């Protein structure tokens, strides 16, 4: 994803472009860091950083280019942007977080094009926001395979933000009442921003 592009800048004032790499090739699948001993968490975080650096090296030296060549040697990490010594992120991106047990749980049947057999997602009277993205699940530490399913423009129902048993607690981002499958379209940043 391009974070900073040259297009909006006047000629001669263009900054170096900045991109975020969030590809399945960069997904660390050898273990998770939830509810693990500090030593195990440190091990997995270090291995994930090593994977990121390996992918970056491949991009610089071996990635196929449109002109038939290989490698993009002009790519470099940006410690000044990321605020880290190596230019990698400060923390890993957790694609699927823990979710609340909500008063309402969004499922694939509410938003999936094929599952609905319709051109419209379910209409929620208590909608607090909208979103639109495919149901996109990357492989996981459980060795689940990649899933990419069409979804429909959907709403964020308030009931998915209200826990069953807790008071004075609202979820943020990916923590709403959704299933593993429906989380694949509710987890995207624009939808997270709508959730809060």
Sequence positions of predicted segments:
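Flavin (FAD/FMN)-binding glycine-rich loop and adjacent Rossmann-like elements that form
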Residues: 1-194
């Amino acid at each position: 994803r391009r974070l900073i592009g040259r297009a909006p800048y006047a000629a001669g004032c263009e900054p170096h472009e900045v991109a975020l790499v969030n590809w399945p090739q960069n997904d660390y699948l050898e273990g998770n860091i939830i509810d693990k001993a500090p030593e195990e968490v440190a091990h997995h975080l270090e291995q994930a950083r090593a994977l990121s650096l390996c992918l970056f090296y491949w991009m610089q030296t071996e990635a196929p280019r449109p002109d038939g060549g290989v490698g993009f040697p002009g790519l470099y990490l940006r410690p000044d942007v990321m605020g880290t010594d190596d230019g990698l992120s400060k923390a890993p991106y957790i694609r699927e977080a823990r979710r609340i047990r909500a008063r309402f749980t969004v499922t694939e049947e509410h938003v999936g094009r094929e599952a609905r057999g319709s051109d419209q997602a379910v209409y929620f009277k208590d909608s607090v926001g909208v979103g639109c993205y495919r149901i996109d699940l990357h492989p996981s530490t459980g060795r689940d395979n990649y899933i990419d399913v069409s979804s429909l423009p959907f709403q964020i129902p308030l009931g998915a933000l209200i826990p069953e048993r807790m008071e004075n607690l609202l979820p943020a981002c990916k923590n709403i009442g959704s299933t593993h499958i429906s989380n694949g379209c509710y987890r995207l940043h624009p939808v997270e921003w709508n959730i809060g």
